[in-house]
Amino acid sequence: MKKQINQQTPFEQHLRKQNLSENTVTSYLWTIKYFTDNYEDFSKENLLAYKGWLLEYFKPKTVNLRIQAINKYLAFTGKDKMQLKQVKVQQKNFLENVISNADYQYFKAQLKADGNIEWYFVVWFLGATGARVSELTQIKVEHVNIGWFDLYSKGGKLRRLYIPKLLREEAQAWLKSIDRTFGYVFLNRFGERITTRGIATQLKTYATKYGISTKVVYPHSFRHRYAKNFLEKFNDISLLADLMGHESIETTRIYLRRTASEQQEIVDQIVTW
């Protein structure tokens, strides 16, 4: 019989005290549940076996997320010395699967032309604010009216998400036309706040409809596009790091790199020998 976690509720409370996102808390709890359902106990042998299984079936980034959850639980239960080492992630020298500015503009134009106004604004808000999809779902009419939205990231750090004037004014006109004067901007067909999964799924559906590669149409792709466009217009990486909510400017430096398709285009033009 598998050993059950008898401290799961306190562990969840411990996680929530750290101001982690709901997705992170859910992911950590799921990881611990999976481990206890499949391994007898938190022995070094079982921990290494679990890590080996992760390495066989998942990408390094996912492996590290699972290891981070395990290590959190081990620290919580006083077993710090048993924590697992994370695996090294080889950083690519190019950005991958980022929507081009041309496709971003085309996507918006098609949504608007077809009368899919709410989704037109979903794409525009993602591309013009740099919001994470979880942040987008929290934006309210009140935030649109004042032009910004304060967020508290991990560790209680304040980040202000700005809504640019052009987007703000057009969004206000749209919200007025549908008589939405308060509350969340983006709702589902039941009148409830839309989910992150709902956004991701619908974006893929529209991408297919308009002939845009679904590989580049996902919520975070528009955050990447925001960063790329920002640096092309205003080359201040320190400011961008603040706007993106990055803890380290090194994280932001990736946006100084070209996408794989941009690299290919440059090579095709330059290398003629």
List PLM regions with ranges.
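Conserved catalytic core of the tyrosine transesterase superfamily
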Residues: M1-W273
